[in-house]
Regions:
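N-terminal targeting leaders
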Residues: 1-179
Length: 179
């Protein structure tokens, strides 16, 4: 079976839903935490799976952020990678942004890995991958990302599917779009 590389492996509705999830959960967390708890939280959604990264000043703030995300509409699951610590400074954020760009550049030029099927998030030197990929694509993406200078650790939160299952999924999505 051939694996689609040009089209997103999520339905158009799932892509839009993920964008809405990110914005809504960001807003909900900022409203819930308020100005009392210092935090820098990044919300990344892929296929209904929500990844929380960043820093929160207190354990209570961390728990509130996670619970808020879990209660949000259309969330399949929440992955908590929030650290209880002082917010990373601008130097660390710039370094993370640069590392994310390097990882994306390497992935886009790697044969048999399709950046269009993944999101790359970097927080404090840790690279997180999210997407819908085959076991081979996941393994290769992990290997490529881990070889980028500055990557302290690489973690995949990708949904792993066989090439056949992805091909069927793409046919189903195409069928839905043609109706």
């Amino acid at each position: 079976a051939t694996v689609s590389t040009l089209t997103d492996r999520r339905s158009a509705g799932a892509v839009v839903n993920d964008e809405v999830l990110e914005k809504r959960i960001n807003w909900e967390i900022s409203q819930t935490l308020g100005k009392n708890i210092d935090s820098h939280i990044t919300v990344t959604a892929y296929n209904g799976k929500v990844l929380l990264t960043g820093e929160v000043a207190t354990e209570q703030g961390r728990q509130i952020a996670v619970q808020t995300a879990e209660r949000s509409l259309d969330v399949a699951s929440v992955i908590n990678e929030l650290a209880v610590m002082e917010n990373a400074g601008i130097g660390q954020r710039l370094s993370d942004s640069s590392l994310a760009t390097k990882v994306r550049s390497r992935l886009v030029t790697t044969e048999n890995v399709y950046l269009s099927q993944m999101k790359v998030v970097v927080e404090r030197g840790v690279v997180y991958l999210m997407g819908i990929v085959t076991p081979q694509e996941n393994e290769l993406a992990l290997k490529v990302a881990s070889r980028v200078g500055g990557a302290a650790k690489v973690i995949s939160y990708c949904d792993i599917m066989s090439a056949e299952r992805i091909a069927q999924r793409m046919r189903d999505i195409q069928g839905q779009q043609n109706q």
